[in-house]
Amino acid sequence: MAKTSAVEKNKRRRKSVAQQATKRAALKAIVMNQSLPIEDRFKATLKLASLPRDGSKTRIRNRCEVTGRPRAFYRKLKMSRIALRELGNSGKVPGIVKSSW
């Protein structure tokens, strides 16, 4: 199990990203627009830099819904390989069976 504080911090970051998404997208569009004057683009860059860092999408870490483990994460199932194996062996994940040939 992951530390509760790490899981909660990630949830807080997801919330912050959702709140800041439109503002960040607008500022990034201004920064990337080559037809605008360099002064306006620079001001937009400064505003973007002044926003909270946790509002950036790259700060989010995919974590297992069951254990909170940050590595070996399967996106489709939203769980780690260890949780998948345990739940799959106990028959709690539909469509997952132990292979044999």
UniProtKB/Swiss-Prot annotation:
<dbReference type="Pfam" id="PF00253">
    <property type="entry name" value="Ribosomal_S14"/>
</dbReference>
<comment type="function">
    <text>Binds 16S rRNA, required for the assembly of 30S particles and may also be responsible for determining the conformation of the 16S rRNA at the A site.</text>
</comment>
<dbReference type="GO" id="GO:0003735">
    <property type="term" value="F:structural constituent of ribosome"/>
</dbReference>
<keyword id="KW-0694">RNA-binding</keyword>
<dbReference type="InterPro" id="IPR018271">
    <property type="entry name" value="Ribosomal_uS14_CS"/>
</dbReference>
<dbReference type="InterPro" id="IPR001209">
    <property type="entry name" value="Ribosomal_uS14"/>
</dbReference>
<comment type="similarity">
    <text>Belongs to the universal ribosomal protein uS14 family.</text>
</comment>
<dbReference type="GO" id="GO:0006412">
    <property type="term" value="P:translation"/>
</dbReference>
<dbReference type="InterPro" id="IPR023036">
    <property type="entry name" value="Ribosomal_uS14_bac/plastid"/>
</dbReference>
<keyword id="KW-0699">rRNA-binding</keyword>
<dbReference type="GO" id="GO:0005737">
    <property type="term" value="C:cytoplasm"/>
</dbReference>
<dbReference type="GO" id="GO:0015935">
    <property type="term" value="C:small ribosomal subunit"/>
</dbReference>
<keyword id="KW-0687">Ribonucleoprotein</keyword>
<feature type="region of interest" description="Disordered">
    <location>
        <begin position="1"/>
        <end position="21"/>
    </location>
</feature>
<comment type="subunit">
    <text>Part of the 30S ribosomal subunit. Contacts proteins S3 and S10.</text>
</comment>
<dbReference type="GO" id="GO:0019843">
    <property type="term" value="F:rRNA binding"/>
</dbReference>
<keyword id="KW-0689">Ribosomal protein</keyword>
<protein>
    <recommendedName>
        <fullName>Small ribosomal subunit protein uS14</fullName>
    </recommendedName>
</protein>
